[in-house]
Amino acid sequence: MPIKSRIRTIPDYPKKGIMFRDITTLLKDPVGFRLVIDQITQHYLENGINFDMIIGMEARGFIIGGALSYTLGKGFVPIRKPGKLPGETVNQEYQLEYGTDKVEMHIDALEKGTRVLLVDDLLATGGTALAGAALIEKVGGVVADMAFIVNLPDIGGQKKLEEKGYSLFSLTEFEGD
């Protein structure tokens, strides 16, 4: 059973007209979760994409990023919602469909020039990933690549990231959503 078939689709959530791709059904399946981690790990080992650290976006990026840090032997740094980190932080505002939001990370999370794999569960508009990349660059890091379980290419995030010069990998896509 492939990864895509383990992802539940919930129509009209969080609002009418949205087809929500719920990865919790994939994560609760031990075989599915192992497939995700094994396939992303294999991709980075086989393709020689070099990075020093894995950074995960709150919250599901923590689940994937933490497991990848273990399998790839890299450290892990979280990017969190404001007010969740105890040390000095730097933040980045980004656009939502209706309004803005912020994410932050510790200002001393990376040494200058650290190459990073940015991880999140799903790529839609690209706003969260761009905010994460901006934070990494603010503290002196370099985004080596981005990894997602799901890409929704018709929403435009992949195109937006690639136009900004970022490369990415995703395990599966849902088109037309």
Swiss-Prot record:
CDD domains: PRTases_typeI (cd06223). Signal peptide: none annotated. It is found in: Cytoplasm. Coiled coil: none annotated. Keywords: Cytoplasm, Glycosyltransferase, Purine salvage, Transferase. PROSITE patterns: PUR_PYR_PR_TRANSFER (PS00103). Its EC number is 2.4.2.7. Pathway: Purine metabolism; AMP biosynthesis via salvage pathway; AMP from adenine: step 1/1. The keyword Cytoplasm applies. GO terms for molecular function: adenine binding; adenine phosphoribosyltransferase activity; AMP binding. It catalyses: AMP + diphosphate = 5-phospho-alpha-D-ribose 1-diphosphate + adenine. GO terms for cellular component: cytoplasm. Homodimer. Belongs to the purine/pyrimidine phosphoribosyltransferase family. This is Adenine phosphoribosyltransferase. It comes from Prosthecochloris aestuarii (strain DSM 271 / SK 413). The gene is apt.
